[in-house]
C-alpha cells in the first residue's frame, strides 16, 4: 500500500482531465455523457432492466476504472429515473489511482446536469484509502463499493455476482494490464448467468480474450467518431462456490422482516443496514434505552490498529474506518463527534519502530509521523514524545451514533425487555416470559458476549474484558488540548465541559461499579501521556472519591476479530465435515447446515466504532446476496464458523 497514490492529472484547454501516467483522456472530448450512455447504459440495456426490477431486487454493476465517477453517476441518474421505488442498485468499481477530492470536484463540474448526484458523491468522498471502501447514497438505496488498488489484486478478493459490466480502463495500448486474460477470467468468475458487458474498445485481442473467458462477444456501432465497440453476454459456467462452510446461505426470499437483539452499536448498525434495504426491523434492547453498555461511554476514539503486513484485522480496520468516518457526517460535529485527529505517542523504542513501519506502509493522508515539537504544536500541550498522527480520526459520542442508526426508517424499538429466541415454523420468535413480543424469519444476535445466553451460540469462545473510563471536568487551561492523544491509554479534547480518560483493562472482574483504584490507574495513564495536561486539569488535587466514570465489558474473541455472519448448527456441522478431523485439506461437497435465518454481529472489542458499522453492511450483504463490502478473505476471517472449523480440526468437540 505504500505505492498507493492519487491520479496525477493535466487539464486541457477545455478544462477536461487527462491522466499524466497513461497519457489518455478520462472520457470523450466531444460528449462524455453521451458516450457513457451509449457505450455502457444502452449496451447493457439498463433502462429496461432497471424498470423491470421487483420490490427488494438489486442489480449489480461492475466496473474496471472508476476514474471521475461519470459512469456511476449516469447509471445512478438513470436508475433513479426509471427504477421502481423498492429496487436497489449496487455498483462495484476498481481504481488504482483515485482522483483527489479537489480534482474530482473540478472534473464533475463539467457536467451541470449531474450536479445533484455529483454533490452527493463528493459529500461521501472522504477517508478514501486503499482497499475496499463502502459508500451509500439515497438512504441506502444505492451502494458504491470502491476497490482502491491494482485491479489484478483487488478483483480476486471480491465476492459478488455482477449483472452488468462496464469495461472502461484507459485504452488497451496505453494500459494493457487492464485488458489481460487474467482480468477477463476474474470478470467471468464474478459474472451472474447471462451478465452483460459493454466496452468502448473493439480491439481483436480484447474480443478474443473475453470469448476465451466465456463471454459471447459481438462488434456493435461505437459512439461518435468511433466506428465499432464491443458488447457481450456471459455464457460460461458458474463460479465454484469454494469452501462450503464459508459459502453464502441462499439469499433471503419472502417477507423482509428481522429481529435484532441488542441495542448497542453492533445491533443498531445491523438494524440500520437492513432497514436501508427496505426491511422492517424490530430492534430489541433489554435496558430502558439504547447504548447502555459498552456503547454508552461519553467519548470513544477512532483509533486505527493497523499492521504493515496487510493482516485481515488491519484490512478490516482500514475499510471500517472509512465507512464510520462517512457515517459521522450525519451527526453534529463538535457535539456528537469531532475529526480533531488522533496522535499515538511513540512512548518507547519498540513503539517508535512499529510507527516507522506503518508510516512507510500507508499514505501520508491516512497517517504520518511527527517529531515531538510538531506533535506539541498540534496537540496544544507539552508531550513526552512525538508519534504517529491520524488526521481524519478523532472522538465520537457512541450513543449519538447509535441513536442516528436506530432512527433509520423501518426500525421499531422494543426496549426494557430481555428476550429469548425460539424457532417456530419459518420464524424466530422473541419471547419475554410466555409472551411473544415479535417474530420474523430472520434474527441477528448483537448482545456482545451475552450471545452465549442463546443456545445456538452458547459454545462460541467469547470473553469479556472490563474497562473503566474516568470523566474529568475541563478547565480553561485543559481546553488547549486540540487532538486525542494516546499512549497505553487515551485522553480526548473536551466534549462540552468534560474530558474522557481511559481505559482500564480487567480480565477478571465481573463487577461494573466504578472503582477508585481504576480511577487512579487512569490518572497514571494520563501522567504518561502528558504531565502538562495532568497539571492543567488539576488532576492531582481532585479527590478520587469525587471522580465520575463508568465501567462496561468489552467483548472479544481469541483472534481479536469480530464474529459477523451466518451461524451453523454445531452438531450437524461436525457430522457434515467430520473428515476434516483426519485431514484438514479435504473440502467435502456437502452444504453447510445453517441455522435458518440466524446471524451474529459481536466480538468487536475496543474497536467497535470502526468495525461494528461496516459489519452491519457485511451482514446485509450476506443476507441479501449483495457484493461483500470487504475482501472475501477478511469476511471469512470474521465468520462465526471459523471456530467450529478450528475445534473440528483440532478434535475439540463440545
Curated annotation (Swiss-Prot):
Q: Which UniProt keywords apply?
A: Cytoplasm, FAD, Flavoprotein, Methyltransferase, Multifunctional enzyme, Oxidoreductase, S-adenosyl-L-methionine, Transferase, tRNA processing
GO molecular-function annotation terms?
flavin adenine dinucleotide binding; oxidoreductase activity, acting on the CH-NH group of donors; tRNA (5-methylaminomethyl-2-thiouridylate)(34)-methyltransferase activity
- What Gene3D superfamilies does the record point to? D-Amino Acid Oxidase, subunit A, domain 2, FAD/NAD(P)-binding domain, Vaccinia Virus protein VP39
Gene Ontology biological process terms in this record: methylation; tRNA wobble uridine modification
Positions of the UniProt region annotated as FAD-dependent cmnm(5)s(2)U34 oxidoreductase: 261-654
The compartments listed are:
Cytoplasm
* GO annotation, cellular component aspect: cytoplasm
What InterPro entries has UniProt attached to this entry? FAD-dep_OxRdtase, FAD/NAD-bd_sf, MnmC-like_methylTransf, SAM-dependent_MTases_sf, tRNA_MAMT_biosynth_bifunc_MnmC, tRNA_MNMC2, tRNA_S-uridine_synth_MnmC_C
Give the EC number.
2.1.1.61, 1.5.-.-
Give the top-rank taxon of the lineage listed in the UniProt record for this protein: Bacteria
The record lists the membrane-crossing segments as: none
Q: Name one Pfam family in it.
A: Methyltransf_30
Segments carrying the region annotation (tRNA (mnm(5)s(2)U34)-methyltransferase) are: 1-235
Q: What catalytic activity does the UniProt entry give for this protein?
A: 5-aminomethyl-2-thiouridine(34) in tRNA + S-adenosyl-L-methionine = 5-methylaminomethyl-2-thiouridine(34) in tRNA + S-adenosyl-L-homocysteine + H(+)
Question: Which cofactor(s) are needed, names only?
Answer: FAD
Similarity field: In the N-terminal section; belongs to the methyltransferase superfamily. tRNA (mnm(5)s(2)U34)-methyltransferase family. In the C-terminal section; belongs to the DAO family.
HAMAP family (UniProt xref): MnmC
Q: Which NCBIfam families match?
A: MnmC_Cterm (TIGR03197), PRK01747.1-2 (NF002481), tRNA_MNMC2 (NF033855)
Tell me the function of this protein: Catalyzes the last two steps in the biosynthesis of 5-methylaminomethyl-2-thiouridine (mnm(5)s(2)U) at the wobble position (U34) in tRNA. Catalyzes the FAD-dependent demodification of cmnm(5)s(2)U34 to nm(5)s(2)U34, followed by the transfer of a methyl group from S-adenosyl-L-methionine to nm(5)s(2)U34, to form mnm(5)s(2)U34.
Official protein name in the record = tRNA 5-methylaminomethyl-2-thiouridine biosynthesis bifunctional protein MnmC
Naturally occurring in which organism (per UniProt): Pseudomonas aeruginosa (strain ATCC 15692 / DSM 22644 / CIP 104116 / JCM 14847 / LMG 12228 / 1C / PRS 101 / PAO1)
> What's the name of its gene?
mnmC
